[in-house]
């Protein structure tokens, strides 16, 4: 993505950077959502953080007492 577009220094100082929305085969679509539009739409302030957090349920390891049981059920299934 570096080098595809240039922003003046003032944009970086104001922390108004384009947001990557989606990619097509030929180009990327970028746009900025201002704070007023975010408030109107009811967007949460930390939506990126909340959607990229790992799910704690998926991160839990299987207890050793159940590991053998899962192997047996897999072989029988």
Curated annotation (Swiss-Prot):
It comes from the Eukaryota. Its main location: plastid. GO terms for cellular component: plastid. It holds the Pfam family Ycf15. It is found in: Plastid. Keywords: Plastid. Belongs to the ycf15 family. This is Putative uncharacterized protein ycf15.
């Amino acid at each position: 993505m570096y080098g595809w577009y240039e922003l003046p220094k003032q944009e970086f100082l104001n922390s108004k950077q384009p947001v990557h929305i989606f990619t097509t085969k030929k180009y990327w679509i970028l746009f900025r959502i201002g704070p007023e539009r975010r408030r109107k739409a009811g967007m949460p302030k930390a939506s990126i953080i909340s959607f990229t957090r790992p799910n704690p349920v998926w991160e839990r390891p299987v207890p050793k007492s159940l590991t053998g049981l899962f192997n047996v059920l897999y072989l029988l299934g």
